[in-house]
Amino acid sequence: MLCLLKLIVIPVILAPVGYPQGLPGLTVSSPQLRVHVGESVLMGCVVQRTEEKHVDRVDWLFSKDKDDASEYVLFYYSNLSVPTGRFQNRSHLVGDTFHNDGSLLLQDVQKADEGIYTCEIRLKNESMVMKKPVELWVLPEEPKDLRVRVGDTTQMRCSIQSTEEKRVTKVNWMFSSGSHTEEETVLSYDSNMRSGKFQSLGRFRNRVDLTGDISRNDGSIKLQTVKESDQGIYTCSIYVGKLESRKTIVLHVVQDEFQRTISPTPPTDKGQQGILNGNQLVIIVGIVCATFLLLPVLILIVKKAKWNKSSVSSMASVKSLENKEKINPEKHIYSSITTWETTERGISGESEGTYMTMNPVWPSSPKASSLVRSSVRSK
């Protein structure tokens, strides 16, 4: 039904209501916007007039280059906005057509979207066509994983690149520690709030600041004094009117800069937390194998240590004995030789003379020296 409506509406718009060949047009200079893959971009198309007039028609065209053929992104006529082709569900007319505004919001930007976007706008009861080109450059997708140490401060960026200011109406930051856990509000901003300020709630109170410039469509935040419990998934929802653009950041909190890098994937569900992953299983198997291989070596080392200890003890005993023998002084054994008186009758009545002989005895000699008795008979 929608395709049939397009076939009917497009010829009606482009033929009867199309611009005559001689219709004058006004082209302004083309601003440049740079946006990362997956983000949103707002391309302004505002007619600057002192009086406000109702927009009669808006066409947004895309071409890779100035000389390339153009394709329709979106067209607006008679209060009907129709996105076309590959831009369906991603392009939205966000300008206030009652105030000369035909701005376009393009969500989930892809690399193929890089090129020149031209807005052609005509006001009611005027023949002049206003043309405003915007050059879009698409950069690689920003990393979704952010690592920070405990106690440090980290920035989390969330913005809409735009040629116009003051288009963001609301910003919400939410936190979840897992896929099945309840979300917590980190920060909330609403342009309709009386205070016009943001609110940080719950355990993030007094630790979160809105550092982005809301007037420039920037809802970035700063998280201070990071805790281990802050690890998880942070989702930024930034609104232009009722249209929401989302950005997800996975925050990993580490103890120090030398700690092993945590896997960038968010916590899994289905009870997988209690199951070892492949890397852990390999590490455990390696430890077990190493233990079995090193056990015999350990046993040999223990036995060798005991044998060395026993040998050292024996040597110490021998040396102690030798030292003891050297320290003890020489001992002499004195023995007396008994003298017997003789009643033998001899010449001049002279009696025999008795003498005592001392021989040294060494402790190391196998046998003690015997007592030697010698008698010298008197002449």
Swiss-Prot record:
InterPro entries: Ig-like_dom, Ig-like_dom_sf, Ig-like_fold, Ig_sub, Ig_sub2, Ig_V-set, Myelin_P0-rel. It comes from the Eukaryota. GO terms for molecular function: protein homodimerization activity. Residues 1-20 form the signal peptide. Residues 24-135, 140-250 form the Ig-like V-type domain. Changing residue 77 to A/F: Loss of interaction with CXADR. One of its GO terms (cellular component) is bicellular tight junction. The keyword Secreted does not apply. PROSITE patterns: IG_LIKE. Residues 21-281 are extracellular. Keywords: Cell adhesion, Cell junction, Cell membrane, Disulfide bond, Glycoprotein, Immunity, Immunoglobulin domain, Membrane, Phosphoprotein, Repeat, Signal, Transmembrane, Transmembrane helix. Transmembrane protein of the plasma membrane of leukocytes that control their migration and activation through interaction with CXADR, a plasma membrane receptor found on adjacent epithelial and endothelial cells. The interaction between both receptors mediates the activation of gamma-delta T-cells, a subpopulation of T-cells residing in epithelia and involved in tissue homeostasis and repair. Upon epithelial CXADR-binding, JAML induces downstream cell signaling events in gamma-delta T-cells through PI3-kinase and MAP kinases. This is Junctional adhesion molecule-like. It comes from Mus musculus.
